[in-house]
């Protein structure tokens, strides 16, 4: 009898690229041409709220450039891929396996060029490389790769410090996180709840920021929209700068749908998001 054998456990779920899979505590996660999957004894399709955003903008010619990276310090699996407007890796989609549930899967998307990745189990911190087409091996007056005109790979250590260090110079690690649009519902006394779904105008008079930790300033933006086809626009008084001593922000924002964005753009800035509170009430139409 054969000691080892291969048994197929699924169809239409194969790897999109040879480096698009990663193993976490006995469970394998991977990116396919048809979505995201995992196998820990049985095949499962991962519910993904950003699937259309990723696959509608995926450069299918460069599928083999897709690579997966595990950041076990924060329970994250990253898939780095090439968007339709690029020829090199430039975007990332991240799944948080620590905090996700079937009812509430946690996904984020971002812009990040990483062509190889190894997690903290090897060096204590995640290490990764970036392919930079704008650099030809010259740093200052020194040339490290003679005759190169095709770009170089730059080696990074992640989760260290507050700034990016590249070629001896520090720059800001620009970061942001934005919620989806939210609206309000109105419950009538003695009657059924009337769902919002953009029917009611709402007014946000103030925001109480809550950061679990913060270094430097952060920026809060309320993006407003009255109709689904409207372009998001910041509230008239925003964006708002939040310092470590900010207790509340008076906003005077008004719309049918609002999303909250937290960001930073300068060096030596860091924040870890807590639970923000917003003073919201129904408002009349004009």
Stretch-by-stretch model annotation:
Residues 13-19, 23-27, 33-286:
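Beta-sheet repeat architectures centered on beta-propellers
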Residues 1-10:
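Surface-exposed extracellular loop regions of Gram-negative outer-membrane beta-barrel proteins
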């Amino acid at each position: 009898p054969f000691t080892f054998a291969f048994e197929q456990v699924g169809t239409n779920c194969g790897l999109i690229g040879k480096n698009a899979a990663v193993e976490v505590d006995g469970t394998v996660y991977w990116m396919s041409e048809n979505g995201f999957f995992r196998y820990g004894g049985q095949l499962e399709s991962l519910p993904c709220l950003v699937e259309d955003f990723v696959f509608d903008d995926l450069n299918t010619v460069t599928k083999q450039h897709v690579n997966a990276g595990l950041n076990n310090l924060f329970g994250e699996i990253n898939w780095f891929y090439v968007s339709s407007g690029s020829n090199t890796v430039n975007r990332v989609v991240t799944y948080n396996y620590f905090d996700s549930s079937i009812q509430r899967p946690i996904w984020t998307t971002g812009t990040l060029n990483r062509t190889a990745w190894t997690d903290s189990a090897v060096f204590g911190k995640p290490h990764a490389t970036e392919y930079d087409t704008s650099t030809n091996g010259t740093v200052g007056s020194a040339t490290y790769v003679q005759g190169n005109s095709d770009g170089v790979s730059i080696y990074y250590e992640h989760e260290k410090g507050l700034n990016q260090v590249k070629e001896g110079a520090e720059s800001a690690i620009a970061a942001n996180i934005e919620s989806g649009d939210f609206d309000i519902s109105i419950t009538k006394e003695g009657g059924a709840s009337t769902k919002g779904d953009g029917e009611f105008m709402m007014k946000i008079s103030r925001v109480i920021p809550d950061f679990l930790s913060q270094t430097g300033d952060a920026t809060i933006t309320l993006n407003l929209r009255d109709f689904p086809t409207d372009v998001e626009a910041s509230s008239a008084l925003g964006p708002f700068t939040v310092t470590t001593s900010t207790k509340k922000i008076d906003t005077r924002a008004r719309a049918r749908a609002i999303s909250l964005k937290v960001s930073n753009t300068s060096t030596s800035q860091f924040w870890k998001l807590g639970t923000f509170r917003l003073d919201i009430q129904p408002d009349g139409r004009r």
